[in-house]
């Protein structure tokens, strides 16, 4: 069993938001082909953000169907473009009602895979300095803490923790040098 990660799929099977304008020609088929070559049913695939361009959860079915039909268990985390994201309960209910069985979410919670705890959150741009950015960063830090604590409480403190984030946790501005 292996763990894979891929983010920023920006799927748009139900909406007209083609990614070929960014040079992503035929990218859905390329994702599918590579996924089928590498991932098997017992593997875990982490999708830390920007999964779908949809604005509402009820419009995401075709995007979820695409990954549901690929092998492996999928765990999604929120990205900055996942405007369809809702409460954990609503998202899980949607998956259940649509019979999408091998997908789940990390959102103030955790997941156990083999001997690992999977935790995470979206994160935020740590270099941004506005008041709203500060609030978002503080909230995301709390979500990360909740996710890690949840994993330790549910699965034990002796297991290694894999943390997923949509925004990399950079601690300094590399554009300034040094």
Q: Where are the language model's segments positioned?
A:
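Short glycine-rich loop/turn motifs that provide flexible caps or phosphate-binding loops at active sites
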Residues: 6, 48, 78, 119-122
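Conserved catalytic scaffold of divalent metal-dependent phosphoesterases
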Residues: 9-16, 86-175
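Short, hydrophobic/glycine-enriched beta-strand segments
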Residues: 2-8
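Core catalytic region of metal-dependent phosphoesterases/phosphodiesterases
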Residues: 2, 15-113, 176-178
